Amino acid sequence: MVRFFQRNDGVIVEAEIHGLPRTENGFFAFHIHEGDTCIGEGFPNTGGHLNPGREVHPKHAGDLPPLLSDHGSAYMKVFTDRFYIEEIIGKTVIIHSDPDDFQTQPSGNAGMKIACGVIQRL
């Protein structure tokens, strides 16, 4: 589950993820994408990283720190001032198979999309 908490100057992102594949280094790229659906194998309609300011990677609004998995589970809590909750409702949050290298354009060589969720207001 990924939850977002609006603050005056940005958003707290809290992720608690279970069932991640075991990998050698345990890092998984974690991004908000511009698309609005998780339908289809490999989630082909999630679009690119959320990037309304047309920044280069890793400065996209949707670029988040990587998840670090321990035996298939990861927990992360981070603050960002790159977006407000209203801007991400209906967008997708993606976990990739590989860590983000923070250099390769346009998406950090993050590998396949292995998990997807549509961001909704509760």
Tell where the protein language model's regions lie, with residue ranges.
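N-terminal leader/targeting pre-sequences
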Residues: M1-L122
